[in-house]
Amino acid sequence: MAAAEGGCGAGVEADRELEELLESALDDFDKAKPSPAPSPTISAPDASGPQKRSPGDTAKDALFASQEKFFQELFDSELASQATAEFEKAMKELAEEEPHLVEQFQKLSEAAGRVGSDASSQQEFTSCLKETLSGLAKNATDLQNSGMSEEELTKAMEGLGMDEGDGEGNILPIMQSLMQNLLSKDVLYPSLKEITEKYPEWLQSHQESIPPEQFEKYQQQHSVMGKICEQFEAETPTDSEATHRARFEAVLDLMQQLQDLGHPPKELAGEMPPGLNFDLDALNLSGPPGANGEQCLIM
């Protein structure tokens, strides 16, 4: 009996040891299993890693990228960053002198922010850009095609202050200075004075052969030319900047009146220097078609 109990106790002990061995093996197996990867939706961002960006920041980056791409395509790559800085500087100067143009540039900026891959947004930006720059582009093109000789164009551009390294890049002052030189005393006065002096005799000899309406226009031309010459003859070396500007505006107004009256007689217009030939239309003084008098020239 005692022997039987001893055999039974040994069996129980063996079963316990086997159970412990199996449990230890299971524990080791569980430890060896790879832990599941953390869910990306609940993992906390690393402090040194990129932070979550707001929709506003994303839109701003898209606008800057669009602007950078625009300047990269418009200018050489080395001038793109300079063009951006010059554009901002030009806008500050423009806001003081031409607020209505600033409104157009604001519309242009808003359109640029909406530029996308679709044809509609690209067309909107292109249309706004053309509207904003049409006057400047039209003047520049007309001046290039006006038939002026190289010497006369060089003379007209003297004094623009476009020295090397100037870096202004502001088209508005350049166009203003160019128009002031084209309508200066040195360019216009000699020929206008000669025509004015010869006009009375020509009118007298052609009075009977010219229709009354056209003859009246020629008389008005003679009068306006005389007023322009008077403006130039009033110039003095001591004139202030305000006086120069007022005289320029007066001459510009008279030149527009002269253009409205049509071309002078060919016999008299032939006295104009080669290249100019009194072609006021080539100077585009009246601005784009459909523009009113107040918008005829950007100044």
From Swiss-Prot:
Residues 297-299 form a propeptide. Residues 2-56 are annotated as: Docking to the peroxisome membrane and binding to PEX3. A lipid is attached at residue 296 (S-farnesyl cysteine). Belongs to the peroxin-19 family. Gene3D superfamilies: Pex19, mPTS binding domain. GO terms for molecular function: ATPase binding; peroxisome membrane class-1 targeting sequence binding; peroxisome membrane targeting sequence binding; protein carrier chaperone. InterPro entries: Pex19 (IPR006708), Pex19_C_sf (IPR038322). GO terms for cellular component: brush border membrane; cytoplasm; cytosol; peroxisomal membrane; peroxisome; protein-containing complex. It is found in: Cytoplasm; Peroxisome membrane. It comes from Rattus norvegicus. Its main location: cytoplasm. Residues 2-91 are annotated as: Necessary for PEX19 function on peroxisome biogenesis. This is Peroxisomal biogenesis factor 19. The modification Phosphothreonine is found at residue 236. Interacts with a broad range of peroxisomal membrane proteins, including PEX3, PEX10, PEX11A, PEX11B, PEX12, PEX13, PEX14 and PEX16, PXMP2/PMP22, PXMP4/PMP24, SLC25A17/PMP34, ABCD1/ALDP, ABCD2/ALDRP, and ABCD3/PMP70. Also interacts with the tumor suppressor CDKN2A/p19ARF. The modification Cysteine methyl ester is found at residue 296. Residues 25-63 are annotated as: Disordered. It is a lipid-anchor. The keyword Lipoprotein applies. One of its GO terms (biological process) is protein targeting to peroxisome. The modification Phosphoserine is found at residues 35, 39, 54, 66.
